[in-house]
Each structure stands twice: as C-alpha cells, then as structure tokens.
Amino acid sequence: VNPLWSFYDEGINPRTRTYSLFALTGTREFMEAVGNWGFLAQVPFGELFWEIRNFVSIVYALLHERLPYARVYHAHTTGYASLLGAAGARDYGTSFLLTEHNLYIRDTVNTKLERNMAKPVTTDYAFLNEEREHPGLGPVTLDERAWSVWFVEMGRFCYPSADMATYLYPKALEEARGIGAPIDQMNEGEKDRAIILPNGMLIESVAEAYYARQA
C-alpha cells in the first residue's frame, strides 16, 4: 500500500482525519520538504507555494466530504476520477474498476505540452527534455513541468488500487506500464487483473439471448 494513503486517512478522509492536510500545506515544514524534491528546488518559493496549494486544494475539495457507498467504483480515466474511485473503495472495503478507454495521462500531458497525441509519456520524464514540436513554444516551463509530474504521479498512485484495469488494445497496456501501471503485479496471480477489452462485441456470443427475445 502506498504510504501516501496515510495522508488521506489522517488529513482528508472525514471518517478518520485528525488534522487538515490543506492547512498543512501552508506550514514551513511542509514547504521545506516539498521544496527539496527534485526540480521543485528550482522553483521560486512564491510560485511553488501557489502551485502546490492549487493541486492540493482540488484533491481536498473532492475528498474532504464523506463519499457515497458503492459496491464497485468505476472510472474510465486516471487522474481525479481514479482518485475518487480508489478512495471510495478504500473507505468501504469494496472494489475499484478502471476502464482506460484511452490513456488519459498521456493525452492530458501531450495536450498541455502541445505534443503529438500519439507520443508516449514515461515515468523517467525524458519527454520533458525533448525539443518542442512547435519552435515558438520554447523550453518546457516550470509550470508545465510541475503540472505534468502531478498528473503522472497521481496516476502512479491510483493504478495499484484498481481491482481490475481494462485497455482497448495491447499497445495501450504496454504504454500504461511505462506510465507506472503495475501490470506485471496485477497479472501475477491465477487471474489477470489488467486485460484487453476491445470495443464492440461478437454477435455470436449474444445470439442465443437475442433470438430468445425475438421469440
């Protein structure tokens, strides 16, 4: 279990919280810890404070109230939808189904950076150092970098909580592995939990039921 879930349990979940995570983001200790992480050390303090506060405020707004009960929580994207699904399943000990109709992290980051939508996004963040496709854009800005890292890491955080994840085609599953989906761990048991589920259906598989209805 990702240790970051303890922040949710202790600082956000209304059923278990003992402090406000949102309030914590304004403390000196929190900002010092965040400011020493990777490229964030290069971000001016004022910009970093508001960047972090914007991200955390969305998470807090989504999760600080008690989530409704469901036997299965379903999201068809990673990002905030998966965060809600994973949190709900954690709260009630139920299931979380992720059906990735497309790779939301890849598409969202590529849209933000104005890259070709088919280009892969990976957890080594090499894509942030690539030459921009449109010369007028210049280097990736600190805001774009922070935004991209936030969405990639949010996906990596949510993926392991899925009881099952589906993909439309094999390449999508492999790209999900590159973004941080634990495909090998999900498929190491007796039954695969990360599977290919293409669009459409085989008519013969439902023919019997169809003809029974016509009778």
Task: Give, region by region, the residue ranges found by the protein language model.
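Short N-terminal targeting/anchoring amphipathic segment
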Residues: 64-80, 94-97, 101
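Non-catalytic, alpha-helical, charged scaffold/linker segments
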Residues: 1-47
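A conserved, positively charged/aromatic
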Residues: 108-119, 155-162
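Acidic anion/phosphate-binding donor-loop and adjacent secondary structure
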Residues: 177, 183-214
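A short, active-site helix/loop in glycosyltransferases that binds the activated sugar's phosphate group
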Residues: 27, 148-190
